[in-house]
């Protein structure tokens, strides 16, 4: 006969390989704090409803706190044969308080228990990620404020397009991260319903108070359908989706840092704290932190894809497949946390190379649009015609191997006689960025105002 907690109808225990494939204690042990919080709320509710006697409630509560203390001290023994964190905690609780521990699982199943634990863990993690994203935004806004006047090339197709400022570029990521925070908060709002009390799938015949349990655990309300409560992993999927989009944003910036720190670009310098050397090439300073952020983005996206594939074919309600929700979710959200910390450190330490950036901003005929705009404003030329004329001027400069600002007035007038000496004022990169005063544009005054507004909105660093 099996001596498992669920083993009453079994004549023997599981095969060793069954025990190995079935056990989740190796990874779900990190749910211990959430599991104990859920059990404390559950047993308090059972006591308040008269389902358990007060002496059993007191014994169970004291026992759970003892188990929690053992885990915090590193003394708790996690045994594979107990399968998961729920059984591990209950087994130790039984050793501490005796038969009363068996009453804890009244009106509860591991199905609603694990759904509650996972929601609590994801909620806690989303709150921590939100604070980390805000810190990275703060670092970017501070850098934007400092480099509102630092001119650099703006790119499309990774080719010089128009001059912008380094501060403007940083603020672009502040905006992306703001949307990421919105997605994390939306996911948190939707997950903040409590499944506890749904039992295996159909609810329970005991007179429980699910609203009280939900309130005790900080949820807005209990989930409304017991089947959905135990079958749902949308909260994990949505959180992984938000994490994946955030990781994509970090990866894009990391890619830029990898390119910009190369000898071929030389746009920025990363500090020694976020670079490594080579075992054979003594001159190397490799942007490993940025490269690892870029790589971990793929890992995070993979976790989302993996869980989507796990869930896509499952009938209601719970299936053991859903045990596979944990490792990917844990790994992805903690990987994102690591990436956010690394990016914030890199941003605070990086040094833009202003001279190189300015020189690059003027290459590739990046002020050609300024010439076209000048033709529209000063000669009342339709933009399409101005575009054509500017293209011819660029071709003339390219044939001579010089920049637009170095092309003679005579050469320009041979293409468009109406061009005057005044045109050269708009061909410099500083004048180009200064002229972009439209809302959201790269003009330094705009950048300073937006950076300050973001810093005020984000507030000081939380200690």
From Swiss-Prot:
Belongs to the lyase 1 family. Argininosuccinate lyase subfamily. One of its GO terms (molecular function) is argininosuccinate lyase activity. This is Argininosuccinate lyase. HAMAP family: Arg_succ_lyase (MF_00006). Pathway: Amino-acid biosynthesis; L-arginine biosynthesis; L-arginine from L-ornithine and carbamoyl phosphate: step 3/3. Keywords: Amino-acid biosynthesis, Arginine biosynthesis, Cytoplasm, Lyase. Its EC number is 4.3.2.1.
């Amino acid at each position: 006969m099996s001596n498992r907690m669920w083993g009453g109808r079994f004549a023997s225990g599981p095969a060793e390989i069954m025990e190995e494939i079935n056990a989740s204690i190796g990874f779900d042990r990190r749910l211990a704090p959430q599991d104990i919080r859920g059990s404390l709320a559950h047993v308090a509710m059972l006591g308040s409803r008269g389902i358990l006697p007060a002496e059993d409630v007191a014994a169970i509560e004291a026992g759970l706190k003892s188990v929690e203390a053992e885990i915090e001290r590193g003394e708790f023994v996690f045994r594979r044969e107990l399968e998961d964190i729920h059984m591990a905690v209950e087994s130790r609780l039984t050793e501490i308080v005796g038969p009363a521990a068996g009453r804890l699982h009244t009106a509860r199943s591991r199905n609603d228990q694990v759904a509650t634990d996972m929601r609590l863990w994801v909620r806690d993690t989303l709150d921590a990620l939100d604070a980390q994203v805000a810190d990275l935004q703060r670092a970017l806004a501070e850098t934007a404020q400092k480099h509102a006047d630092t001119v650099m090339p703006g790119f499309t197709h990774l080719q010089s397009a128009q001059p912008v400022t380094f501060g403007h570029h940083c603020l672009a990521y502040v905006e992306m991260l703001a949307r990421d925070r919105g997605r994390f908060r939306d996911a948190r709002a939707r997950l903040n319903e409590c499944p506890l009390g749904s039992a295996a799938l159909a609810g329970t015949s005991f007179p429980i108070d699910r609203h009280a349990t939900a309130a005790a655990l900080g949820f807005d309300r209990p989930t409304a359908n017991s089947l959905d409560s135990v079958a749902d992993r949308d909260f994990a999927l949505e959180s992984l989706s938000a994490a994946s989009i955030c990781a994509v944003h970090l990866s894009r910036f990391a890619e830029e840092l990898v390119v910009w720190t190369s000898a071929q670009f030389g746009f920025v310098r990363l500090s020694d704290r976020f670079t490594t050397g080579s075992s054979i090439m003594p001159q190397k300073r490799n942007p490993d932190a940025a490269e690892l952020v870029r790589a971990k983005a793929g890992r995070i996206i993979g976790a989302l894809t993996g869980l989507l594939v796990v869930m896509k074919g499952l009938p209601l309600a719970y299936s053991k497949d859903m045990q596979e929700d944990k490792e990917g979710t844990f790994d992805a959200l903690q990987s994102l946390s690591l990436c956010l910390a690394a990016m914030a450190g890199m941003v605070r330490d990086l040094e833009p190379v202003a001279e190189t950036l300015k020189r690059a901003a003027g290459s590739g005929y990046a002020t050609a649009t300024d010439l076209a705009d000048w033709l529209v404003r000063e000669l009342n030329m339709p933009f399409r015609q101005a575009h054509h004329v500017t293209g011819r001027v660029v071709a003339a400069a390219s044939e001579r191997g010089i920049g637009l600002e170095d092309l003679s007035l005579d050469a320009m007038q041979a293409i468009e006689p109406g061009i005057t000496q005044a045109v050269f004022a708009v061909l410099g990169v500083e004048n180009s960025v200064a002229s972009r005063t439209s809302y959201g544009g790269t003009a330094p005054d705009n950048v300073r105002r937006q950076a300050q507004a973001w810093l005020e909105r984000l507030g000081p660093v939380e200690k």
